Every structure is written in C-alpha cells, then in structure tokens.
Amino acid sequence: MAVFADLDLRAGSDLKALRGLVETAAHLGYSVVAINHIVDFKEKKQEIEKPVAVSELFTTLPIVQGKSRPIKILTRLTIIVSDPSHCNVLRATSSRARLYDVVAVFPKTEKLFHIACTHLDVDLVCITVTEKLPFYFKRPPINVAIDRGLAFELVYSPAIKDSTMRRYTISSALNLMQICKGKNVIISSAAERPLEIRGPYDVANLGLLFGLSESDAKAAVSTNCRAALLHGETRKTAFGIISTVKKPRPSEGDEDCLPASKKAKCEG
C-alpha cells in the first residue's frame, strides 16, 4: 500500500489551526506531512526561524486513517527568491536551513529558475500557479534538476479558491509536463485551512488534469515525495551513500601480464 504525503501545510502563528490541518491530513489518509515555513527576503525583517517543534503541536500524534500508526510530521523551509543575492543562503546550506527536513526554493525569474535547477542546495523547486507563468520552461535546466534528484512542486489549493488561479495552475502544469514528462513532480496542498486539503486519490485524479499519466499522478503524492525526503536527508547530513569495491590482488599468473613499470613496483 502506498504511503501518501502532503509536503506543504502552511505554518502560521495559530498552533490550533495548524493542529487542525495535521488532523485533517491524517483523517484523509496522509502518512507524512511537512509544515512549511516561508521566507521572502524581498520583505523587510525576514529571517529563517527555527522550525516548529512537533511537541508544541501534539502530545499524542493523530493516527492515519486506514493505518495503525501515527502521522509523521516533518518541517519544511521555502525561500522565495526574486534577486540573485537571495540565493546565497542556499548555495552552501546554512546552519538554520539545515534544521529543516525539506528545503524548497520559489524562483521568480527565468534566471533564478536556472540557478535553482543547476546550483542551489535544495530539495524542491516550486512552480508558479497563482499568476501567469513569467517565463517558458527550458529543457537543459530541468534535465539537470532531474539528474540532481530535485523535485518540481505544484500546489492545488489556489485552484480550489479561484477560477482564474485554476487556469494559471493548469497552464503552468501543462507547460512543465511538456518538458519534464512527469518525472520528479510532486503535488501538495499549500493548505492554510482544513477545507483546502483533498484526499490523496482526489489529488492523483487532479494530476491527470495537470497532464500526468495515471502512474505519475499517483507517484506525485507518494513515491516522488519519498524521494524528495530522502534527498533532504542526504542534504542535511552532507553525505551520500558511498559504494566501495575491494580490488582483488593479482595472482602470480596475472603478474606476467602487467606492464613493466607496474611489474617492477609489485616486485619492489
């Protein structure tokens, strides 16, 4: 059975409202959620805060509907970048950013989108859905992002609220799918209220409207989310998985086949 995730529940100052979001997600069958703290350096006095502690939200975690285990609550940081200087905090992951399980970047220009895909130390690249896409997607940076293990995130709650945003969301999604062909796409709610969250199978059906195949749409709320979380774990520890192969020593018969220089070293 698939493990479903919603990696964008909007963090606010109201902890009671945040609890309601998490409880609703668990009731709908999500096993993993991420509480999203958003920073826009274009606004004054913006800084990266410490993530919300799970212990502040719940003494006992809600049980996932249809499962016998509690929901897993992770933390996420999203940086909105509208100027190249905003990227500095994400080039070599800052100590504050490393406190978060997931780090996302929301680039506002084509140049910043290219930088995000090719250089920034993040897990997710957010796609604009609340306004007309300010640039066209190009294949080279998207292919680099896929090779680096980054995921592209589309959010659906704006499409629920407003018909104009619904058009923007579908248009942005279809433009993205033309290039990435459904690879490394995740779909999140960006919910601020419980009524804005939809069940994982409803979200997968929504993915069909976004141009995803049936299997890619399901992956967008399950396996692709898991891959993004594993990418975040690697980023936080700054170590990948290293595979070592022990080189066998040459046998006496093999030494006759060695070049003269290497044979001399072996004899020495």
Swiss-Prot record:
One of its GO terms (biological process) is tRNA 5'-leader removal. The modification N-acetylalanine is found at A2. Keywords: Acetylation, Nucleus, Phosphoprotein, RNA-binding, rRNA processing, tRNA processing. The modification Phosphoserine is found at S251. GO terms for cellular component: multimeric ribonuclease P complex; nucleolar ribonuclease P complex; nucleoplasm; nucleus; ribonuclease MRP complex. Residues 247-268 are annotated as: Disordered. It comes from the Eukaryota. One of its GO terms (molecular function) is ribonuclease P RNA binding. Gene3D superfamilies: Metal-dependent hydrolases. Autoantibodies against RPP30 are found in sera from scleroderma patients. Component of ribonuclease P, a ribonucleoprotein complex that generates mature tRNA molecules by cleaving their 5'-ends. Also a component of the MRP ribonuclease complex, which cleaves pre-rRNA sequences. Component of nuclear RNase P and RNase MRP ribonucleoproteins. RNase P consists of a catalytic RNA moiety and about 10 protein subunits; POP1, POP4, POP5, POP7, RPP14, RPP21, RPP25, RPP30, RPP38 and RPP40. Within the RNase P complex, POP1, POP7 and RPP25 form the 'finger' subcomplex, POP5, RPP14, RPP40 and homodimeric RPP30 form the 'palm' subcomplex, and RPP21, POP4 and RPP38 form the 'wrist' subcomplex. All subunits of the RNase P complex interact with the catalytic RNA. Several subunits of RNase P are also part of the RNase MRP complex. Belongs to the eukaryotic/archaeal RNase P protein component 3 family. This is Ribonuclease P protein subunit p30. It comes from Homo sapiens. The gene is RPP30.
